[in-house]
Design a protein with these regions (language model features):
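C-terminal accessory extensions appended to soluble enzyme cores
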Residues: 1-25, 187-199
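N-terminal accessory interaction module
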Residues: 24-41
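Eukaryote-skewed repeat-based solenoidal scaffolds used as protein-protein interaction platforms
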Residues: 39-45, 49, 54, 62-199
Length: 199
């Protein structure tokens, strides 16, 4: 088990679960690609962001060797925080652990000068007490709609969580990865990225 305790700073963590805090980011990328394409990407990197809306095994190395992976990310205009899974059937302890890991990696990336956009992810309502911890209001956030639109239960959970996120975080802009969803984002600016074109 890798804990990354040498990277953790209790003075930059918040709440009962001591989740690392991220500074807000106001950058909006023109295009995004998956982390799994970073190593082979040969095109221009200006205006390009890197997302982690992938199976966890494809970016677990961000936790195992973060500094080595960050070297490959430095030339991109921004990076999203890792989207570690928060499946409904996972024990709560694992969900908290995955939120902690995502924030800590985001903090490490910010410390070396990367523009970091927090990824919003949540499960059932009981997860709201920790899923949005460590995020300061007013910046740009990203979220995925994959697997949500065609599943009524998942769509309900997504909308409830997004309601909570907008109320708590008051985003300047939300970057949505996936298909458009029937949801009122109110006064929040929204930019969609088609998952089929984010390679």
């Amino acid at each position: 088990m890798i804990y990354r305790l040498s990277e953790y700073d209790e003075n930059r963590a918040i709440g009962y679960y001591q989740i690392p805090v991220l500074k807000p980011c106001y950058y909006v990328p023109e295009q995004i690609i998956g982390f799994n394409y970073v190593k082979s990407w040969r095109k221009a990197r200006d205006g390009i962001g890197v997302h982690f809306f992938l199976d966890d095994y494809q970016f677990e190395r961000m936790w195992i060797t973060p500094h080595r992976q960050i070297e490959r990310l430095k030339d991109f205009s921004c990076v999203f925080t890792p989207d570690f899974s928060l499946f409904l059937d996972m024990p709560r302890a694992m969900k908290i652990w995955n939120v902690y890991r995502s924030r800590l990696i985001g903090q490490i990336m910010q410390d070396v000068g990367l523009k970091v956009i927090p990824t919003l992810s949540w499960g059932e309502e009981e997860t709201f007490e920790f899923c949005f911890e460590g995020l300061e209001p007013g910046g740009v956030f990203t979220v995925s709609t994959r697997g949500v639109v065609r599943n009524k239960k998942a769509q309900g959970i997504w909308k409830t969580g997004m309601d909570f996120a907008i109320e708590k975080l008051k985003p300047k802009c939300i970057l949505c990865y996936g298909v458009r969803i029937d949801y009122d984002f109110r006064d929040t600016e929204v930019k969609y990225f088609d998952a089929r074109k984010c390679n």
